[in-house]
Amino acid sequence: VTKETVIQGVVHRDDAPLAGAYVRLLDATGEFTAEVPTSATGQFRFFAAPGTWTLRTLAPGAQPVDRAVVAEVGVTDVDVYVG
Protein backbone atom coordinates (compact mmCIF):
# COMPACT_ATOMS: atom_id res chain seq x y z
CA VAL A 1 0.00 0.00 0.00
CA THR A 2 3.00 2.32 0.35
CA LYS A 3 2.94 3.27 -3.35
CA GLU A 4 -0.81 3.85 -3.49
CA THR A 5 -3.03 6.46 -1.92
CA VAL A 6 -5.87 4.95 0.09
CA ILE A 7 -8.65 6.88 1.81
CA GLN A 8 -10.50 4.63 4.23
CA GLY A 9 -12.54 4.87 7.36
CA VAL A 10 -15.72 4.14 9.25
CA VAL A 11 -19.10 5.88 9.21
CA HIS A 12 -20.70 6.19 12.65
CA ARG A 13 -24.15 7.07 13.95
CA ASP A 14 -24.68 7.39 17.70
CA ASP A 15 -21.13 6.08 18.29
CA ALA A 16 -21.92 2.82 16.45
CA PRO A 17 -20.68 1.79 12.98
CA LEU A 18 -23.31 2.41 10.30
CA ALA A 19 -23.90 -0.19 7.58
CA GLY A 20 -25.72 0.73 4.39
CA ALA A 21 -24.60 4.35 4.11
CA TYR A 22 -23.00 5.62 0.90
CA VAL A 23 -19.75 7.53 0.75
CA ARG A 24 -18.95 9.60 -2.34
CA LEU A 25 -15.49 10.78 -3.32
CA LEU A 26 -15.44 14.28 -4.82
CA ASP A 27 -12.33 15.86 -6.33
CA ALA A 28 -10.97 19.34 -5.51
CA THR A 29 -13.50 20.95 -7.88
CA GLY A 30 -16.44 19.08 -6.32
CA GLU A 31 -16.74 16.70 -9.26
CA PHE A 32 -18.09 13.21 -8.48
CA THR A 33 -15.37 10.56 -8.76
CA ALA A 34 -16.63 7.40 -7.05
CA GLU A 35 -19.18 6.02 -4.60
CA VAL A 36 -19.10 2.99 -2.31
CA PRO A 37 -21.55 1.56 0.23
CA THR A 38 -20.35 1.04 3.77
CA SER A 39 -19.79 -2.53 4.88
CA ALA A 40 -21.65 -4.32 7.68
CA THR A 41 -19.10 -2.75 10.05
CA GLY A 42 -19.47 0.76 8.57
CA GLN A 43 -16.18 0.64 6.68
CA PHE A 44 -15.37 2.22 3.30
CA ARG A 45 -12.25 2.47 1.13
CA PHE A 46 -11.17 4.42 -1.94
CA PHE A 47 -8.00 4.26 -4.01
CA ALA A 48 -7.23 7.82 -5.09
CA ALA A 49 -4.47 10.16 -6.19
CA PRO A 50 -2.68 12.29 -3.59
CA GLY A 51 -4.41 15.62 -3.04
CA THR A 52 -7.46 17.28 -1.53
CA TRP A 53 -10.73 15.36 -1.65
CA THR A 54 -14.20 15.65 -0.17
CA LEU A 55 -16.02 12.67 1.30
CA ARG A 56 -19.80 13.12 1.06
CA THR A 57 -21.63 10.65 3.27
CA LEU A 58 -25.29 9.87 2.61
CA ALA A 59 -27.24 7.91 5.21
CA PRO A 60 -30.98 7.25 5.54
CA GLY A 61 -32.62 9.74 7.88
CA ALA A 62 -29.60 12.04 8.07
CA GLN A 63 -28.40 15.17 6.31
CA PRO A 64 -25.44 14.64 3.94
CA VAL A 65 -22.10 15.15 5.67
CA ASP A 66 -19.11 16.57 3.78
CA ARG A 67 -15.61 16.00 5.13
CA ALA A 68 -12.49 17.48 3.54
CA VAL A 69 -9.52 15.10 3.37
CA VAL A 70 -5.92 15.71 2.34
CA ALA A 71 -4.60 12.37 1.12
CA GLU A 72 -0.95 11.47 0.68
CA VAL A 73 0.71 8.30 -0.57
CA GLY A 74 -0.12 5.60 1.97
CA VAL A 75 -3.28 5.24 4.03
CA THR A 76 -5.41 8.14 5.24
CA ASP A 77 -7.89 7.06 7.92
CA VAL A 78 -11.09 9.08 8.32
CA ASP A 79 -13.97 8.69 10.75
CA VAL A 80 -17.28 10.23 9.66
CA TYR A 81 -20.18 10.92 12.02
CA VAL A 82 -23.76 11.34 10.77
CA GLY A 83 -26.77 12.58 12.75
Feature names for model-found ranges:
Residues 51-61:
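A short, solvent-exposed beta-strand micro-motif common in secreted/extracellular proteins
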